[in-house]
Swiss-Prot record:
Functional note: Oxygenase that can act as both a histone lysine demethylase and a ribosomal histidine hydroxylase. Specifically demethylates 'Lys-4' (H3K4me) and 'Lys-36' (H3K36me) of histone H3, thereby playing a central role in histone code.
Native source organism of the sequence: Drosophila virilis (Fruit fly)
Low complexity bias locations: 52-68, 104-116, 162-174, 184-194, 252-279, 313-335, 394-404
This protein's name: Bifunctional lysine-specific demethylase and histidyl-hydroxylase NO66
Chief localisation class: nucleus
């Protein structure tokens, strides 16, 4: 029959043909198919053939597979010569399951493309049918296929609505009542599901069919919730690309919910040919390809429709969803849609904000790191806390409240500060600029030319003594150091007033004190004193233990004065100032910090044994100075007790120190200070020249002179006259006799003759004072230029054999010098020579024993040469030692202890 059209061709005429992309093979969850061997097929064919003969040689099998659903035989079997009523019943049975809700597939993936199309199983089973019967059956099949196509097109128009892209081609679930097999295709890329008519072309490109392996379990991916686990080859449902599709589908799915639910009650579902016919744009494909593509697209449409797959445990009997469950699913769908709309609007808001950023907030910042110049919107607009000043992102509730607003209005602009706020900002900026100018001026005065007009050299070429003198000049400028020492040093008090409040602010501040208390372990009495002076009585309120900030500030709030005894241990700027000045003064330069609350006084009137420099850092304080009460108190060697106001006369000096001012007064000067009624006071007292008088030298000198005279002169070792007690003493002081005069004369002659110190003895006494300085001094603050030229910048490492490799090597061509002018002292201790040094001292006062190294007498000349050459560099070859090896050894030993610095860095 040449003009007869096959069922395959009939479907091809109805649907346009499209080229399907190749499918990727899934790496996980492979489909489990039952491979039927020829032997198995032969057995089944023989069995069914015998059954057909027993039933009267019917044209159809005892149990037919229509649309992928195995149905039981009817009482009146339908053959190839049935009339039109049989065709109508067949169409009704097929159309009853086609309501765009499901997809049919059997366990073996052998779905028939049409109930009338001959399958592979029927080929060997119907060998007894004649050619005439086959041609007539083919005619019936063609007619039936055409009727089915017409019916399906009407079904698509009635049930699926006009929007075929979003909801018109959602298919039914796969149902097999005999095997209870539920096979569901997992969703692929969401962007591929925009049109059900392109299910095959788009879904076949992703290998995302996830089947139940054993036929009795199913993988159910509900569209109401997000599936976290995606099948391989497909993307997760609910991705950003399907936002528009899901929105349209959700709006259209409510209109078709009744028809979809009714179609899901049928026990048979549509086959691949029917599903293709329901979509006019679907392309014709082989049966196997259509089965896979249909399962894939139908599951995606089923997910988008919000309907769940039927659980295999209920045997597919309870397919009618209760009204409460439907309502719950609709609510979940609405929430899902709302979330998707919020995401879209947030993206649009972010894009508009980036395009239309406010001038004061060029970058999007979080609330914690936002620019302070951009205040928050009002509380009603943004719902944010009013305390912070920042430019926040739009609140999460804003998109939900303004979902219908255009995207260009979604982003919030950072409002400009009000006029009064801008004025305050300008005032703060001016104050900051003034502070910066004053600090720069202070730095210029600190880094200006030396008083003698000498230009400062590079750091590694500077003289530490001159640097200490420069620091003194920074304290007292515009006064010169020469005028200061000639007019005021150890004579009169001196005040230098400045109109620079931030002149000393880099040294210490209220904030630095608080940080110091938190970061370091300071103890009361050892590091901090808490004092008050009320009604002529000074009291100390030191508790035990560590000085924690709450405790210290609690005392301060109660009107107590806080004294920090060793701030140079914890504050680097104060330490650097003291370390540089001690090189110039050749003695320890200490520092105390006094923090006094308003309208209070912490200490009673007294005098000290130090030369005092008072640096007013913050606030105001009134100072009054008095003359020493006794002549012996002038330049006192020890501090006094507390005086009462009645013991003091009229003050010699009465003035108020303001921030940036400095006050100097000699040791032995009685002083007291009281805070202003409205302002607190923070000042630093630098103490200089403590126990640095001639008396201290003689205390070191005379015992040594006497001991040496006794050792070398016999006259000092002779015994006293027997009658000396009868002529000398307190009771005999008023008597006049020759024996008394003789005894007094002999004693004076011995002192004048044998106790006159020699130059060497005076040198030794000075060395002892210098030795004390080496023990008390602060360690040097090594600058970066010095760091790379000293041992402090050296780094050693090991080679592959575990041997240590040093990154330095001194030779005779290496030029070296001392790190500081007073970094070491050569002292004779008995029969040995020692080199004392302070480079390894602790930051606390005399925490450790003095550091020293013993050298051979022949090596002393090398140390002396280095001390004499300072601040110039000296080549190792010029050290006065006999051999080059010994010169290198001595220089290396001093360099490794941090006492020497090379002219050129090793690295």
């Amino acid at each position: 029959m040449a003009d007869e059209v096959s069922a395959y061709a009939a479907y091809g005429k109805t649907l346009p043909k499209k080229q399907a992309p190749k499918r990727r093979q899934a790496k996980r969850w492979p489909k489990k198919t039952t491979k039927q061997t020829p032997k198995t097929l032969a057995k089944r064919t023989a069995k069914r053939a015998s059954g057909d003969k027993a039933n009267g040689q019917n044209n159809g099998a005892a149990a037919k597979r229509q649309n992928g659903v195995q149905t039981k035989p009817k009482a009146q079997k339908l053959g190839t010569h049935d009339n039109a009523s049989a065709d109508a019943r067949r169409i009704d049975s097929i159309s009853g399951s086609i309501h765009c809700n499901g997809v049919n597939s059997n366990n073996n993936n052998n779905n028939s493309s049409s109930s009338s199309m001959p399958s592979k199983k029927n080929k060997g089973r119907r060998s007894d049918v004649s050619d005439t019967e086959q041609s007539e059956s083919l005619d019936d099949t063609v007619n039936l296929a055409r009727k089915m196509a017409d019916y399906l097109s009407e079904c698509g128009e009635q049930n699926c609505g006009s929007d075929a892209d979003s909801s018109g081609s959602s298919y039914g679930e796969y149902d097999s009542s005999d095997n209870d097999d539920n096979m569901s295709g997992e969703s692929g890329s969401a962007s591929e599901s925009e049109s059900c008519s392109e299910d095959y072309d788009k879904s076949s490109g992703s290998d995302s069919d996830n089947e139940c392996g054993d036929g009795d379990s199913d993988v159910d991916c509900d569209s109401d919730v997000d599936c976290d686990s995606d099948s391989e080859g497909g993307s997760a449902w609910g991705s950003e690309s399907d936002d528009q599709f899901s929105e349209e589908y959700t709006l259209n799915s409510h209109a078709n919910s009744s028809s979809n639910n009714n179609s899901s009650n049928n026990n048979s579902s549509s086959n691949n040919s029917n599903s293709s016919a329901s979509s006019p744009e679907a392309s014709v494909m082989p049966a196997a390809g259509r089965r896979k593509a249909t399962k894939r697209s139908e599951h995606l449409a089923s997910n988008s429709d919000g309907s769940d797959f039927i659980d295999s445990n209920n045997n597919n009997k309870n397919k009618n969803t209760p009204p409460a469950a439907k309502q719950q699913k609709l609510q979940v769908q609405q929430r899902l849609k709302q979330k998707q709309l919020e995401k879209q609007e947030k993206r649009a808001n972010a894009a508009v904000q980036r395009e239309n950023a406010a001038p004061f907030c060029p970058l999007q910042r979080t609330a914690t790191t936002a620019a302070k110049s951009c205040p928050l919107p009002s509380k009603e607009a943004a719902g944010a806390k009013p305390g912070r000043k920042s430019c926040p992102l739009p609140s999460k509730s804003a998109p939900a409240a303004n979902k219908m607003a255009p995207n260009k209005m979604a982003a919030k602009m950072c409002a400009l500060p009000p006029k009064n706020e801008r004025a305050a900002q300008q005032q703060r900026k001016r104050a900051e600029r003034d502070e910066q100018r004053q600090e720069a001026k202070g730095r210029r005065s600190e880094n200006e030319l030396l008083p003698e007009g000498k230009q400062r050299q590079q750091v590694h070429l500077q003289d530490s003594i001159e640097e200490g003198k420069r620091m003194l000049h920074w304290l007292i400028n515009p006064m010169t150091s020469d005028d200061f020492f000639s007019q005021y040093w150890e004579r009169n008090a001196c005040q230098v007033k400045r109109k620079q409040p931030n002149y000393f602010s880099q040294l210490i501040s209220f904030k630095l004190i608080d940080e110091m208390l938190i970061r370091n372990h300071l103890e009361f009495t050892t590091n901090i004193d808490v004092t008050t002076y009320k009604n002529g009585m000074r009291e100390t309120h030191n508790p035990d233990g560590r000085a924690m900030p709450p405790t210290v500030w609690g005392f301060y709030s109660d009107g107590c004065s806080i004294r920090i005894l060793n701030p140079s241990t914890y504050l680097i700027k104060v330490r650097q100032l003291c370390a540089m000045m001690q090189e110039f003064f050749h003695c320890l330069v200490g520092a105390n910090v006094y923090l006094t609350p308003p309208n209070s006084q912490g200490f009673a009137p007294h005098y000290d044994d130090i030369e005092a420099f008072v640096l007013q850092v913050e606030g105001r304080k009134r100072w009054r100075l008095y003359s020493p009460l006794h002549p012996s108190d002038v330049l006192a060697r020890n501090s006094s007790g507390n005086y009462s106001q009645a013991e003091l006369g009229e003050p010699l000096f009465d003035a108020v120190l303001e921030p940036g001012d400095i006050l100097y007064f000699p040791r032995g000067t009685v002083h007291q200070a009281v805070c202003d009624q409205q302002q607190h006071s923070l000042h630093i007292t630098l103490s200089v020249y403590q126990q640095q008088a001639y008396a201290n030298l003689l205390e070191e000198l005379m015992p040594a002179v006497l001991q040496r005279a006794i050792k070398h002169h016999l006259s000092l070792r002779r015994g006293l006259p027997l009658h000396i007690w009868q002529h000398l003493g307190l009771a005999k002081g008023d008597q006049k006799s020759e024996l008394r005069d003789e005894l007094l004369g002999n004693t004076k002659r011995l002192v004048q003759q044998y106790l006159m110190p020699s130059d060497a003895q005076i040198d030794a006494a000075v060395d002892q004072l210098a030795k004390r300085f080496q023990h008390e001094a602060l360690p040097p603050v090594v600058l970066p230029e010095e760091h790379e030229r000293t041992v402090f910048g050296s780094r050693s490492q090991a080679n592959s054999h575990g041997q240590c490799l040093c990154d330095y090597e001194l030779t005779e061509r290496t030029s070296v010098r001392l790190l500081r002018a007073n970094i070491l002292r050569l002292v004779a201790e008995g029969s040995s020579l020692r080199v004392y040094y302070y480079v390894d001292n602790a930051l606390e006062f005399c925490k450790y024993e003095a550091n020293f190294m013993e050298i051979q007498p022949t090596e002393a000349a090398a140390v002396e040469a280095l001390m004499s050459a300072y601040p110039k560099y000296l080549k190792v070859a010029k050290l006065p030692l006999r051999s080059a090896e010994r010169r290198i050894e001595v220089a290396t030993a001093l360099w490794e202890r941090g006492l020497l610095m090379t002219e050129q860095p090793f690295k």
